[in-house]
UniProtKB/Swiss-Prot annotation:
The keyword Cytoplasm applies. It holds the Pfam family Methyltransf_32. Residues 130-332 form the GST C-terminal domain. One of its GO terms (cellular component) is cytoplasm. The keyword Cytoplasm applies. Residues 190-232 are annotated as: Disordered. The gene is GSTCD. InterPro entries: Glutathione-S-Trfase_C-like, Glutathione-S-Trfase_C_sf, Methyltranfer_dom, SAM-dependent_MTases_sf. This is Glutathione S-transferase C-terminal domain-containing protein.
């Protein structure tokens, strides 16, 4: 084995799934996307491992044409994965210490970009892939439509399309049409007004565009246009702005004010900005993810069903434009992607275009209007025998002996005031008591939405015979938790930066302190799937809403009594428990919290659990002081 040169940073291993391959494409598409980003960033700082099943040939020569050129890739079996990675969905990145893992496509891709920039700080354009405020694909798929589109729906839809394609004209995946619809929507950027006024000025200088009084009519027909006009002129405002970002060049600041008729133009009269790339004007990580997926989709379409291209002209135009981005063609070539050229297929008449208004949106729900207070809803529940009811606290006076524990165990070590740290200790007293009374030697405990690790670190220290795993989507919070753990020398703790759904391991107890909105429901569902006990303290009731996974109310008992709108009214008022509110209002908020959590408890009971809704002690430890404790029967 060749000697590995020591570096200033800890060596990291990147693990990618491999199921099968076709010409120029490795499946699953998450792997193709990851390899394409590595090629685009010219990143060679990871030790790359392709993970295959026993049924797949491990002859690397068969894969060479579709892998990145000049990059060494090791082929291993799933049994050879480090234990922490065996508990996660791939792709995954793990440090050599084997106790810190990043899992899931969006998390791994963002990490690759960050590490590539750290390896070569001159490549500032790589950071631009993360978008405005560096938030591109940062939120989890459950709350971000772009993360869900890029990480889940588009790759899965195209994999199914490629698997099922035959000689018969196929049905275009609805996810493709949803993406086409998004490309037809007006662009929204942080400096929207400034750019639209610049565009208006440019249009007037070029003698194009309608008079200002007809600006609204222009906006109405925008969604029926393709990007044909955008492509026809390299001097268009959108392209100038987009490519200045790609080369990290700032346009010189102008000291001249805009003409009076431009400054005074109404916002409704300004021309809309047109999509240059997926999310709007700027080339981002979303484009990187979509490109390999859309390319392999178009290969089949052009080969067998070219007449279908009329159904997504904006997507075809985006595909052409993205090839002009610096380094994209080189990166694609290294990954075995041979771009298609579709110049004649972009000139599509208006009559041939599909009616995108009939395409369902990416979001499958809309928030109901909130009218009135919660009392009618609460009275309706009482008529059905459903009342506010808390189970007695098992030991309201029990506390962790914080004085004898190492300083790094206490939340006082975190960046918070002494009053807040005291309340955090009180919250932990409640959860730790329940968990320590349930846990047995050898149990695996998972701290979901762990944040800075306040719960998980205490449990790992107090239960050395148990394995504790912290799962958190925010990198900096998890890094702080690992630093505290390292100070304590804990050897029974894992750190996983991922959406909780990418944790696939078995466990015995799931814990979550103040998991926001539907995250509490995701934790409970995850525990029920593995028949694990759960101890959760919900938060952010106002963020609860129907999602692709959950519909509210959840339990059959509540469904028979309340509509979704009535349940949302309870959630809205459940958030009104802040200490500065009047006592009567806080009481109603506490009652609404209890009813929302009783619905969660009843739903878990329908799945074979014994569940209690308990009020934490003292109640002043937090405005959100409910605790839902469930044990499989």
């Amino acid at each position: 084995m060749k000697a590995i040169k020591k570096s200033l940073t800890e060596e990291e291993y990147l693990y990618l799934d491999f199921s099968h391959q076709t010409k120029g494409c490795i499946f699953p598409l998450h792997t193709s996307v990851t390899l394409f980003l590595l090629s685009y960033c010219d990143c060679k700082i990871f030790k790359i491992c392709l993970v295959v099943t026993k049924e797949v040939s491990t002859d690397s020569s068969l894969l060479r044409d579709d892998l990145i050129q000049d990059v060494e890739i090791q082929i291993i079996s799933r049994q050879e994965l480090p234990p922490i990675v065996q508990n996660c969905c791939l792709p995954a990145v793990v440090e050599r210490s084997d106790n810190f893992c990043r899992a899931g496509l969006a998390v791994v891709l963002r990490h690759i970009i960050q590490k590539s920039y750290e390896a070569d700080p001159l490549k500032k354009e790589l950071l631009e892939l993360l978008g405005f405020k560096k938030t591109c694909l940062k939120a989890c798929a459950e709350v971000s439509q772009w993360t869900r589109l890029c990480e889940l729906t588009i790759p899965l839809a195209i994999e199914n399309f490629l698997r099922e394609s035959s000689d018969q004209p196929p049905t275009i995946p609805v996810e493709i049409l949803q993406l086409e619809k998004k490309l037809s929507e007006p662009v929204r950027v942080h400096n929207d007004d400034k750019l639209r006024r610049q565009k208006l000025k440019q249009q007037k200088a070029d003698g194009v565009g309608p008079p200002l009084t007809k600006g609204k009519a222009k906006s109405k027909v925008h969604t029926q246009e393709t990007s044909e006009e955008l492509d026809s002129s390299s001097e268009s405002l959108e392209l100038k702005v987009a490519f200045s970002k790609l080369t990290v060049q700032e346009e010189p600041a102008t000291t001249n004010r805009e003409p009076s008729h431009i400054r005074k133009a109404k916002a409704s009269d300004l021309p809309p900005l047109e999509h240059v790339f997926a999310e709007g004007l700027y080339f981002t990580l979303a484009d990187i993810v979509l490109l390999p997926c859309i390319h392999h989709f178009l290969v089949i379409i052009c080969k067998k069903f070219s007449e279908k291209l009329v159904e997504f002209p904006l997507l075809a135009s985006w595909y052409q434009r993205i090839q002009e981005v610096p380094r994209v063609k080189t990166a694609a070539s290294k990954c075995g992607i041979q771009f298609l050229h579709l110049p004649k297929l972009l000139t599509v008449s208006t009559e041939q275009r599909p009616n995108l208004s009939e395409v369902p949106g990416v979001e499958g729900h809309s928030d109901p209007l909130f009218i009135g207070g919660p009392r009618p809803t609460m009275a309706k529940l009482m008529e059905k025998g459903i009342e506010v009811m808390f189970s007695p606290h098992p030991c309201p006076t029990w506390t962790v002996d914080w004085n004898v524990l190492p300083a790094a165990v206490s939340p006082k070590e975190g960046k918070m005031s002494s009053d807040r740290a005291l309340r955090k200790q009180q919250q932990l007293n409640n959860l730790v008591y329940v968990v320590t009374n349930q846990a047995k030697p050898g149990d695996r405990i998972v701290d979901f939405c762990s944040g800075g690790g306040h719960v998980g670190i205490v449990l790992a220290h107090m239960l050395p015979s148990c394995q504790v795993t912290l799962i958190e989507n925010k990198e900096l919070s998890l890094i702080r938790a690992k630093k505290r753990s390292d100070e304590l020398g804990l050897s029974n703790i894992w750190f996983i930066q991922a959406n909780m759904e990418y944790f696939t391991g078995m466990f015995n107890i799931g814990v979550a302190l103040h998991a926001c909105g539907v995250a509490t429901d995701m934790v409970i569902e995850h525990c029920i799937k593995t028949r694990a006990s759960f101890v959760t303290c919900p938060c952010c009731y106002g963020f609860i809403q129907n999602t692709s996974k959950f519909n509210f109310p959840k339990s059959e008992q509540f469904k028979k009594t309340l509509s979704y709108k009535e349940h949302m009214i309870l959630c809205r008022f459940a958030d009104q428990t802040a200490v500065q509110l009047p006592p009567q209002r806080r009481l109603i908020g506490k009652q609404c919290m209890c009813l929302v959590d009783l619905d969660r408890a009843r739903a878990a009971e329908e799945c074979g659990y014994s569940v209690q809704v308990i009020s934490m002690e003292p109640e002043s430890c937090s405005p959100k002081n409910n605790m839902i404790v469930g044990v499989p029967i």
